[in-house]
Design a protein with these regions (language model features):
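Phosphate/pyrophosphate-binding loop motifs in nucleotide- or prenyl diphosphate-using proteins
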Residues: 1-168
């Protein structure tokens, strides 16, 4: 028997969180996860556009995995990282190192997105990362969300900005 992708349970404007709770489709948790999902798809486009030998492909893929972890945390309300999970703090340090290594004084300016399709997609992903971060701060008013998760989202947009400049 084939499993169907549709259930019809969402036809009335409700959807389920991972633990089964039914919520409105515009619930802040659903909205936030939708924004993060869009960012993840944009990062997938960026990775697909990058040359196969670009070392940033692996970092971007690892960021995609962390975004999926964040979505899971939001969907099941386990919004605090286990103390042994160092993946977020490690990635924050990694992003900060990349940003520091690739930032020069002449790069601090407003940038018109473009130059190449890859650079433009990176700038688009950067703007989506900022949208995600804003939705996550809204979510955090009513739900717990780990400080390291919030820090990662803040660094992510900076990283994408610098990466876009580097590939331009």
């Amino acid at each position: 028997m084939t499993m169907k992708i549709y259930t019809k349970r969402g036809d009335q404007g409700k959807t389920s969180l991972r633990h089964g709770e039914r919520v409105a489709k515009d619930d802040i948790r659903i909205e936030t996860n939708g924004q993060i999902d869009e960012l993840n798809a944009l990062l997938g486009i960026v990775v697909a556009l990058m040359p196969a030998d670009n070392p940033e492909r692996e970092r971007l893929h690892n960021l995609q995995l962390l975004l999926m972890k964040i979505m899971g945390m939001i969907a099941d309300s386990s919004n605090v990282l286990p103390s042994e999970d160092k993946s977020f703090s490690s990635m924050i340090v990694d992003l900060e190192h990349y940003i520091d290594e690739n930032t020069s004084k002449d790069r601090f300016c407003f940038v018109v997105p473009g130059g190449s399709l890859l650079a433009a997609q990176l700038q688009f992903a950067r703007t989506k990362a900022r949208t995600c971060e804003r939705r996550m701060w809204t979510l955090r008013r009513d739900y717990t969300l780990d400080d390291e998760v919030m820090s990662l989202m803040n660094r992510l947009s900076d990283y994408l900005f610098i990466l876009a400049l580097c590939v331009q």
